[in-house]
A protein has these predicted regions:
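Conserved beta-strand elements of the Class I
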Residues: 279-282, 374
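Reductase modules of NAD(P)H-dependent flavoproteins
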Residues: 124-131, 246-247, 251, 305-406
Length: 406
């Protein structure tokens, strides 16, 4: 449908233009989530994921415009008889599936593992669109144009193959990570200790995360993002997992010796972003894990770090022994905020409903505008904390977060 010489009217031309823009954005969308290291470190996965979402929906809407205009321009023509049209229709169906399951309401109803598997159909859609574009697209006939598009597709495909497949496989084979043992940390929270070879050469820092695939024979291809909950060591790593959903429930039942496939490390909420001076960290639930690793790793002065730890129940507070050690030896101040949620939009528990968000933050750390502020937790909660931090004058360059969820 991208270009029939028999219908060179304005409707057909606009349809072809919409198709070209859609293809451009679709390739950009693929590259944004190809996990190219220098792009990921420059912008962060949370920003790239947001751009990926925007470009994806924009590309899909342009694709729909292309389909509608082509149907109008070529009314009466048997389009299914055109070369590559069956593949194009299959590509459209695959992309519709991806878009529908990416709408927030639908996404909330799906478990991460199932959503991730469905999302992979986007690659099928991109690949199946190729015959349609190059076989009947008149805009693709000039040699220079064909070279550009083949190069763009090759770059996108190569980025995915290198950084999503080859590099993770190479690191997996090189470091040979296996599960050493599993310890409970709190109700519904377990830590997985892993050992491997040459872990001192694994380019990971405290605060980063991997996508983990545990080769236990069940759902092996399903990856889950979990951050390190302790500083990386030359002989061991630790992750801590909240036991919800299929993937994390499997993790809690892993046996020692289970091999692990890793993809990463990802994330830029590390010591590299630390500007120096006092630190205030705010964690909600399992979001404490990367912040605990940073508390061990950052070179803040004695008594210059505060951890605000938000949980629903006292028994959900994890890592008490480590936090007590950090309090005694490095002067870390622990501020537990325990209780059910307050009104929508607040990061405080219901007990503190009389406090405004910004005022509460200032009362915890009066000079917080001069601190590096690290935040990790659910998206809505993190957004509330960021809003309060900006209200009390924390510069954008000192606000750090990593949203590695879906």
């Amino acid at each position: 449908m991208a270009g029939r010489d028999e219908a060179p009217d304005g409707v057909a031309a606009w349809g072809r233009l919409a198709a070209l823009w859609s293809a451009d954005l679709l390739l950009i969308q693929v590259v944004l989530m190809a996990r190219i290291p220098w792009i990921e470190q420059a912008y962060g996965q949370d920003t790239l994921a947001r751009w990926h979402r925007w470009t994806g929906f924009a590309s899909f809407h342009l694709l729909l415009v292309h389909v509608v205009l082509a149907l109008i321009a070529y009314a009466g023509i048997d389009l299914l008889a055109e070369p590559g049209m069956l593949a194009a229709c299959t590509a459209l169906a695959a992309l519709i599936l991806v878009v529908v399951t990416s709408v927030r309401r639908a996404r909330r109803r799906l478990r991460y593992e199932r959503w991730h598997l469905l999302h992979l159909y986007a690659y099928l859609g991109v690949g199946l669109a190729l015959p349609h574009e190059f076989l009947i697209g008149s805009d693709f006939r000039p040699p220079a144009v064909r070279a550009f598009w083949w190069g763009a597709y090759a770059f996108a495909a190569g980025s995915v193959l290198i950084f999503r497949l080859c590099l993770p496989l190479w690191r997996t084979l090189r470091h040979r990570l296996t599960v050493d043992h599993i310890d409970p940390e709190a109700p519904g929270l377990v830590s997985v200790y892993l050992r491997g070879r040459r872990l001192d050469r694994l380019p990971v820092r405290a605060g980063q995360f991997f996508v983990w695939r545990f080769l236990d024979g069940r759902g092996t291809l399903r990856g889950n993002p979990f951050s390190l909950s302790g500083p990386p060591r030359g002989d061991a790593l630790r992750i801590t997992v909240k036991v919800v959903g299929d993937g994390s429930s499997r993790v809690a039942a892993l046996r020692p010796g289970t091999r692990v496939l890793i993809e990463g490390p990802y994330g830029r909420m590390t010591a590299a972003s630390y500007a120096g001076g006092p630190v205030t960290m705010l964690a909600c639930g399992v979001g404490v894990t990367p912040l605990l690793a940073l508390l061990w790793d950052l070179p803040y002065g004695l008594g210059k770090a505060t951890l605000v730890y938000r949980t629903r129940h006292p028994q959900e507070v994890a890592f008490l022994a480590e936090l007590e050690w950090l309090a005694e030896h490095r002067g870390v101040r622990l501020v537990p905020l325990v209780g059910p949620r307050a009104a929508a939009g607040s990061w405080l528990p219901a007990e503190y409903a009389d406090y405004d968000d910004a005022g509460a933050l200032r009362s915890i750390s009066p000079d917080i505008a001069a601190h590096d502020v690290y935040v990790c937790g659910p998206d809505a909660w993190t957004t509330s904390v960021f809003r309060a931090a900006r209200a009390v004058g924390v510069p954008p360059g000192r606000l750090h977060r990593e949203q590695f969820g879906w």
